[in-house]
Amino acid sequence: MSAQDFLVELGTEELPPKALTSLGEAFLAGIEKGLQAAGLNYTGKQVYAAPRRLAVLIRQLDVQQPDRSINIDGPPLQAAFNAEGEPTQAALGFAKKCGVELAEIDQSGPKLRFSQHIPGKATTDLLPTIVEDSLNDLPIPKRMRWAASREEFVRPTQWLVMLLGDQVVDCTILSQKAGRESRGHRFHHPETVVITTPANYVEDLRKAHVLADFAERRELISKRTAELAMQQEGTAIVPPALLDEVTALVEWPVPLVCSFEERFLEVPQEALITTMQDNQKYFCLLDSEGKLLPRFITVANIESRDPKQIVQGNEKVVRPRLTDAEFFFKQDKKQPLETFNERLKNVVFQAQLGTVYDKAERVSKLAAFVAPLIGGDAQRAGRAGLLSKCDLATEMVGEFPEMQGVAGYYYALNDGEPEDVALALNEQYMPRGAGAELPQTLTGAAVAIADKLDTLVGIFGIGMLPTGSKDPYALRRAALGVLRILIEKQLDLDLTGAVEFAVKQFGAKVKAPGLADQVLEFIFDRLRARYEDEGIDVATYLSVRALQPGSALDFDQRVQAVQAFRKLPEAEALAAVNKRVSNLLSKAEGAIAEQVEPKYFDNANEFSLYSAIQQADQAVQPMAAARQYSESLARLAALRDPVDAFFEAVMVNAEDAKVRANRYALLSRLRGLFLGVADISLLG
């Protein structure tokens, strides 16, 4: 079967830049779906997306749909005809369903069968519907109409190219009649561009100053920006999302270096970077020490004969933005940061839990409680907690919400607060996402933990638990943040005490009974997914969870020890033994004695196991005290041989009650040694 390249390009007014790549990918996916449904084969595919066009190239597409045969079985012959040989309703209904007379139905087999040969259609007849369906299915939240047309699309359409080989696919879609004429760059080549063949699409447009390939434009911008930054003895800040957005804004990218007055560098650089990136789509430059340079890179959509005009225009546009940031910074510094707390008395945190001012006071007290437990300073943590929300009421954060925490840091330093107190105002929000930076100071860690625990306890306390995908207060992220800080910073905090302290602070605002346990369970449940992501089996997590450690660091140390233990040759057998022992002990009548009485031993293997347990107990006690859990389990692995010998030679449920009870006590001692680390009976 012969095959040819197929190209479809829909020209539009400027498409939403943040949605450009997703629209292109969805367009391709829709066309592929239609081709597959039609049984049309092809060898390759490519999507192109630029500000004024979406295009798909399908390589070596079948020009003819293959013929198809369909066979539909109906009712059995016995049910299709009565004793007189007349057709029943079942037979007549089947024929009607197939759209034919009963005489056209095959009656030679055990069932009625309808067979039909369907000749394939020409691909040119199928493509218009496939393309139209794909465009209709694009993820467009809000469609628009234009002029007198009743058609709807994300932006008004301007032209349509549809070629199969060198032939135009005759159709009209979204008010545009298909042809082979595209459009070039709006200024460099406003004339139409004739697309000779689908394979020449990219090069035909390149001659018209349009780079249709999104990836090519992105790479060009990235490479040229890096080169220009190097020429300025700096490094460009190029967030992937911003690079994608800029790529979606230009058809013929030309990066240019611009500058601004050095006086603006007195403003926190985070504010300057935020406004230049978010509002102007500029790439900022940093020096070798990470300080902002008074220069930036803009990406023009034109190769100007006088690029200085473009540079001056961008410098003129950015100046008012930077002036605003400068004004807010100076205004906020006219009063101490702490005074902004008064404004927070009128800002509601949550209707049932009070104001942001109330939250800051709770965070202050909880941070002061947590700090000494992790090696920090209670007074400085309390101070940082008190100031933690002040910058939310400042002009700077009002204009640039992304500056919360960062603005507080600069204002605290301006007021002469200690460095760690100032840093904590920003570190309280860490980690800001999965894998993001953690607090570097103990004061910051204490405030971050306190802030997150306060939110968890408060929201749980009024019954607003996260459900499914709904988590408006980001409680899952808060819990994971607490765990990451404690585990990755190696901070040994008993969360039980901290959560109970947080509960008491809310008083009658929350339903206290069982609240602490509920919050702790939620927090430690987050570890399950964390360990699964690290490739740690869920059974390992459950073996430690059964002991309910209150410290996240201690929990993690136990998990790592169990994971190492499972690699030992003795692990599987000892896990099975622990499970057997657990089952035996659960059936014991009455309390199990704490002391083992050797006088009731009547088998040498009992003495051997008892001696091995005694020696192991003495060896692992100092290990347990030092939380050397891996070493402890490695030592306990040596119990395998005496344990195996015991169960081979000894009947635990002896007839003599005292002997039986003594054996239960011996096994309880054995199990207790392992429970010092984890319940390894759950590993089986």
Curated annotation (Swiss-Prot):
Segments forming a coiled coil: none
Q: Superkingdom, according to UniProt? A: Bacteria
Catalytic reactions of this protein: tRNA(Gly) + glycine + ATP = glycyl-tRNA(Gly) + AMP + diphosphate
Compartment annotation = Cytoplasm
GO CC annotation: what is one? cytosol
The question of whether Glycosyltransferase is a record keyword is answered with no
Member of which family? Belongs to the class-II aminoacyl-tRNA synthetase family.
Question: Subunit structure, per the record?
Answer: Tetramer of two alpha and two beta subunits.
Q: What is this protein called?
A: Glycine--tRNA ligase beta subunit
Name the encoding gene, please: glyS
